[in-house]
């Protein structure tokens, strides 16, 4: 599960990243707020942990902007402000939970789990292929219980192939699915993404039918998924 952390305190950030990764999360850490706006336009996260006291933009302003732009991911606010009014402002701006520094990392973990679990009031739907799990809502992938970090195009390609497992898809079909009619796409883009998927998951996952296209076999036709 992928988390975005926006925190400018290096010592605190280091500790949070270590604790969250130890708990199985994939963590992207930014020390300023404005880059988060760009990242969230192109990347998918299960939750955002946001410090209010950032060097380039106030966290409340950042949160309001995210909500105005339609971002619905769960947000956990971190701040040194302990006044009731500050907590109310944060919640009214669109945060889902609030923690006051200093805090125990165990509590952060517990709150984050609860936040993701109750996000949108339901468990996230999954697509399963053997030991591979895809979470379409957050575009996250796990393999044998471990998170696998994919680019948006890699995720989309994997989803397309698994959704149609047992069917050969031509390079042109896959390129159309990924890029539409964008003539600026590299001619070997599909091959590059497939190469990366094989490295990040396992080499036998995607088969090349020479002169025809690519296929992920149906599970009853597939070889046993190898252990890492």
Question: Language-model segments: which ranges?
Answer:
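Positively charged, aromatic-enriched patches within helix-turn-helix-type DNA-binding elements
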Residues: 140-205, 210-212, 217-218
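Flexible, glycine-rich phosphate/dinucleotide-binding loops
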Residues: 84, 215, 223
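Short, Lys/Arg-enriched segments at the junction into DNA-binding effector domains
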Residues: 2, 110-168, 219-228
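Structural detector for helix-capping/boundary residues
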Residues: 43, 106, 130-132, 137, ...
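N-terminal/domain-start alpha-helical segments
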Residues: 1-122
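Short amphipathic alpha-helical/adjacent loop interface patches that line ligand
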Residues: 24, 109-112, 136, 178, ...
């Amino acid at each position: 599960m992928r988390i975005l952390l926006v925190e400018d305190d290096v010592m605190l950030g280091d500790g949070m990243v270590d604790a969250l990764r130890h708990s199985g999360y994939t963590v992207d850490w930014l020390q300023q707020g404005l880059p988060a706006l760009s990242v969230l336009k192109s990347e998918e996260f299960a939750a955002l942990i946001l410090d209010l006291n950032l060097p380039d933009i106030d966290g409340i302003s950042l949160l309001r902007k995210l909500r105005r732009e339609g971002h619905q991911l769960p947000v956990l606010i971190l701040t040194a402000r302990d006044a009731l009014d500050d907590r109310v402002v944060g919640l009214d701006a669109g945060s889902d939970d609030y923690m006051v520094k200093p805090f125990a990392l165990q509590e952060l973990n517990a709150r984050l789990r609860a936040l993701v679990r109750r996000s949108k009031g339901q468990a996230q739907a999954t697509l399963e292929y053997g030991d591979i799990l895809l979470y379409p809502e957050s575009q996250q992938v796990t393999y044998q219980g471990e998170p696998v970090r994919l680019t948006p195009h890699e995720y989309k390609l994997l989803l397309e192939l698994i959704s149609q497992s047992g069917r050969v898809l031509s390079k042109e079909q896959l390129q159309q699915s990924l890029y539409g009619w964008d003539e600026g796409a590299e001619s070997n883009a599909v091959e590059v993404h497939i190469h990366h998927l094989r490295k990040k998951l396992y080499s036998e996952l995607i088969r090349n039918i020479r002169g025809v296209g690519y296929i992920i076999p149906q599970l009853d036709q597939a070889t046993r998924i190898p252990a890492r």
